[in-house]
Amino acid sequence: MTKAVFHPDYPAFLAALKERILHARTTAARAVNRELALLYWDIGRAIVEKQQLLGWGESVIDRLSADLLGAFPHMSGFSPRNMRDMKRFYLAYSDESIWRQPVAKLSKSLSSDLNQNWRQVVAKLDQSPATTDFLRQLLAQIPWGQHLLILNKLTDPTARLYYLRATAQLG
C-alpha cells in the first residue's frame, strides 16, 4: 500500500480545522447552557406564578414532572427534584430589591478597579424594569450545574452575586 503524499501545508490546514471544530463545539455548548438556564428560569417563574395565582400546591411539580417526562421521554432535566430547583432558582433571583442593596454594599468593599465595574452594575440595577433582563442575562452566562452549586452552598444574596459575577467573568 502506498502512502499518499500531501502538500507541506496540510498539517497546518488540519490543525486549523481541528481548532475551528473545537471552537464551534465550545460555542454550541455555551449556547445550549444559556438556553437551558433561561428555560429553567422561565419554568421556575411559570410554576411560581401559577401557584400564586391559582393556589396550586407543591404536588403540581410532581404532576408537571411526570407529564413533561412523558411528553419528552428522551430529554433529561424534568425530574421533580430538578423542577423544584428551577422554582428555587427563580425565587432566589427574582426579587429586584434583593439585588440593589447587596450590589451597592459589595461595590464599597472592592478595589477601585473592580469598583468601577460594580458601579456600572448598580447603575443597571437602578434602571428598573431592565433589572430582570439584566439578571436574566447574567444568569444565562452560567451553566445549570454551577447555579445549583451556588444555590446549595450560599444563602446570602451578596455572596451569590459575587460568585455569579466571578463565574460569568472567569468561567
Regions found by a protein language model. Give the residues of each.
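Basic, low-complexity intrinsically disordered segments
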Residues: M1-G171
